[in-house]
UniProtKB/Swiss-Prot annotation:
One of its GO terms (biological process) is glycolytic process. The keyword Magnesium does not apply. It is found in: Cytoplasm. Catalyzes the reversible isomerization of glucose-6-phosphate to fructose-6-phosphate. Keywords: Cytoplasm, Gluconeogenesis, Glycolysis, Isomerase. It comes from Vibrio cholerae serotype O1 (strain ATCC 39541 / Classical Ogawa 395 / O395). The keyword Protein biosynthesis does not apply. It catalyses: alpha-D-glucose 6-phosphate = beta-D-fructose 6-phosphate. HAMAP family: G6P_isomerase. Its EC number is 5.3.1.9. This is Glucose-6-phosphate isomerase. One of its GO terms (molecular function) is glucose-6-phosphate isomerase activity. It is an enzyme of class 5 (isomerase). Belongs to the GPI family.
Length: 550
């Protein structure tokens, strides 16, 4: 059980509130000028391959001291221990939270209700290994005797976002199989995917724990119907469909051999499920050995998180700095900006990871909170974002803390592309931190031969205030192991913030109401009769929809 501690009632929170009165005037230029060792003091290395520089943040030693005190006063250490021990910290669903067990490469026992889950975890891994080797090696044949060339993962939310992000991030490690991901119940998503695959050589993975998820099962049945138009015999379904599920009865009724059903457990949350059987598409894309490297990387970060004092603990530090901006500076969003095209889905993945976890307005006592909880998460790869939204980050009126992520070594050594990419990576955090003064702008314009009148008119528009905070996360190279490090780092950051905010991070009741109402509305769309059972707006929209289709 997690303790119920209102963070605003702690001494540390009160100290941070008082500290903010002077800290809101903090100036990064001055902080660096005052301390030549600032980078060394406010950066951390993870192993040999990751450097996290948090020196360009609006914090000093006193800020960090109070933030670490907040972590201790809200009993973060007990919460970490409870999660890793398999206690039911997802209290509203009475479930343990053990995605960490899925990547427990030490194989030390992890108990849920007194039973070690590791034998079951290892059994599913072994089953996925054997299955994937048959498919990748060409031993698995389709209904006409041809080997599989394409894999279509049908899922939504955690059954889609994680595997899609990872397979894209690790394209340099992929084999000959072509991966496709279908999530949206909009028929266009499935229709466009099916245009590009051959029923004789396509394997579908249906990812739904209950095998009842509306979007996933709608898409799965559409894929099955399309397949049977070519194959004819329903017995052939078993050669082209596998299930990531626990509902053996429904899987068998669909036509899938339950030998090709890969299970996971109720202690695996959807947005943390890529480490489970939901990761089968990852294994089919990059091979089992690389998937194990991904698990190993995450396990390394788990060990760091569990065993490192808060003052040197990377996920804890990042979480606390995020709380400083969210709850004291009034920042409403955070941007994740990977300078690596392979990571183009990384921000979208953690948009779900963060916003579904910490988008809560009720505390662990069931009372509305009186403080801000989860931030809005967004982002795009650099340098694309520089030509889209960085304008607002640099010169807008909103404070947007940013995480910049980049590899030192590219997988594609094309001319001087990577040096140009990285020059932008380094330049952006420098520009955001230190800006450009009116004097510097004036000197620049004078050098360009502008008149005094032109200079006076232009200067205000060309000044950069700076003092925009950033973290820089430099990775030697994006590999399965370092990607595992990064994903687990952000997972634990989110967990830490939820603990301190006194909310439950592992349920997601906010997705339920819309689904319930959609199930009520669906039969109302079956005919042309006018609808009157809702509010005037919803009635008007449904009736306009029907009129457009008449």
């Amino acid at each position: 059980m997690l303790k119920n501690i209102n963070p605003t009632q702690t001494q540390a929170w009160k100290a941070l509130t008082a500290h903010f009165e002077s800290a809101q005037d903090m100036d990064l230029k001055a902080l660096f000028a005052q301390d030549s060792e600032r980078f060394a003091k406010y950066s951390a290395r993870f192993g040999q391959d990751i450097l996290v520089d948090y020196s360009k943040n609006l914090v000093n030693a006193e800020t960090m001291q109070h933030l670490f005190a907040l972590a201790k006063e809200t009993d973060l250490q007990s919460a970490i221990t409870a999660m890793f021990k398999g206690e039911a910290i997802n209290q509203t669903e009475d479930r343990a939270v053990l995605h960490t067990a899925l990547r427990n490469r030490s194989n030390s026992p992890v108990l849920v209700n007194g039973e070690d889950v590791m034998p079951a975890v290892n059994a599913v891994l072994a089953k996925m290994k054997a299955f994937s080797e048959r498919v990748i090696g060409g031993e698995w044949k389709g209904f006409t005797g041809k080997a599989i060339t394409d894999v279509v993962n049908i899922g939504i939310g955690g059954s889609d976002l994680g595997p899609y992000m990872v397979t894209e991030a690790l394209v340099p490690y992929k084999n000959h199989l072509t991966m496709h991901f279908v999530s949206n119940v909009d028929g266009t998503h499935m229709a466009e995917t099916l245009k590009n695959v051959d029923p004789e050589t396509t394997l579908f993975l249906v990812a739904s724990k209950t095998f009842t998820t509306q979007e996933t099962m709608t898409n799965a049945h559409t894929a099955r119907d399309w397949f049977l138009k070519a194959a004819g015999d329903e017995a052939h379904v078993a050669k082209h469909f596998a299930a990531l599920s626990t509902n053996g009865k429904a899987v068998a009724e669909f036509g899938i051999d339950t030998d090709n059903m890969f299970e996971f457990w109720d202690w695996v949350g959807g947005r943390y499920s890529l480490w489970s059987a939901i990761g089968l598409s990852i294994i089919l894309s990059i091979g089992y050995d690389n998937f194990v490297e991904l698990l190993a990387g995450a396990h390394e970060m788990d060990q760091h998180f569990v065993n490192t004092p808060f003052e040197s603990n990377i996920p804890v530090i990042l979480a606390l700095i995020g709380i400083w901006y969210n709850n004291f500076h009034g920042a409403e969003s955070e941007a994740i900006l990977p300078y690596d095209q392979y990571l183009h889905r990384f921000a979208a993945y953690f948009q779900q990871g963060n916003m579904e976890s910490n988008g809560k307005y009720v505390d662990r006592d069931g009372n509305p909170v009186t403080y801000q909880t989860g931030p809005i998460i967004w982002g795009e790869p650099g340098t694309n974002g520089q030509h889209a939204f960085y304008q607002l980050i640099h010169q807008g009126t909103k404070l947007i803390p940013c995480d910049f992520i980049a590899p030192a070594v590219s997988h594609n050594l094309v001319g001087d592309h990577h040096q140009k990419l990285m020059s932008n990576f380094f330049a952006q955090t420098e520009a955001l931190a230190f800006g450009k003064s009116a004097q510097a702008v004036q000197a620049e314009l004078e050098k360009a031969g502008k008149s005094a009148a032109e200079i006076a008119a232009l200067v205000p528009f060309k000044v950069f205030e700076g003092n925009r905070p950033t973290n820089s996360i430099l990775v030697k190279q994006i590999t399965p192991r370092t990607l595992g490090n990064l994903i687990a780092m952000y997972e634990h950051k989110i967990f830490v913030q939820g603990v301190i905010w006194n909310i439950f991070s592992f349920d997601q009741w906010g997705v339920e109401l819309g689904k319930q109402l959609a199930n009520q509305i669906l039969p109302e769309l079956a005919d042309s009769a006018a609808v009157t059972s809702h509010d005037s707006s919803t009635n008007g929209l449904i009736n306009a929809f029907k009129a457009f289709r008449a």
